[in-house]
Design a protein with these regions (language model features):
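C-terminal secondary-structure termini that scaffold catalytic or DNA-interacting sites
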Residues: 1-3, 13-17, 21-29, 34-40, ...
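Short, basic (Lys/Arg/His-rich) helix/loop patches that form interaction surfaces
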Residues: 9, 17-40, 46-88, 92, ...
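Short, mixed charged/polar active-site loops
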Residues: 4-8
Length: 138
């Protein structure tokens, strides 16, 4: 985890099912997505980016970190979740050091609901739900 801080993530029912499926394929282990070189380390961001390039996406189209940006944008735009819960879900620190010293809430219950909502949202898109393009200019 970034900055070597523990980050606990609530899992939706869909993600739990996917992890079980992946575990059956990989034989389980410490990492859901281990490095291709050793099971003792996680898969690198470069490996994910290389996979995106092989799928035809340029760096301008998408990067692995871009998935986090997309999630942040869509979660914020939904109007359903507090900014604090979204930032905690993404393991972002607070730039305001005074606020960070006093605001240590995990927003756990909201993040549990948000994780399930996000998986349900992606499921709807996968089966043909309406996709609204975001204006890159603003």
């Amino acid at each position: 985890m970034k900055m070597q801080r523990e980050h606990v993530v609530p899992l939706s029912t869909q993600v739990v099912a996917l992890f079980k499926e992946v575990g059956e394929l990989t034989g389980g282990g410490r990492f859901v997505f281990p490095s291709v070189r050793t099971k003792l380390r996680p898969m690198s961001e470069n490996t994910l980016n290389a996979a995106l390039r092989r799928m035809g996406y340029s760096n301008d189209d998408m990067t692995s970190h871009g998935f986090r940006s997309t999630a942040s944008t869509l979660l914020n735009e939904s109007g359903k979740w507090s900014v604090d819960a979204i930032e905690r879900a993404l393991a972002h620190g607070d730039a305001d050091t005074v606020r960070a010293a006093y605001h240590r809430g995990a927003h756990w219950q909201e993040r549990v609901l948000m994780a399930q909502w996000w998986s349900d949202y992606l499921d709807r898109l996968r089966v043909g739900g309406q996709v609204i393009p975001l204006d890159r200019a603003g």
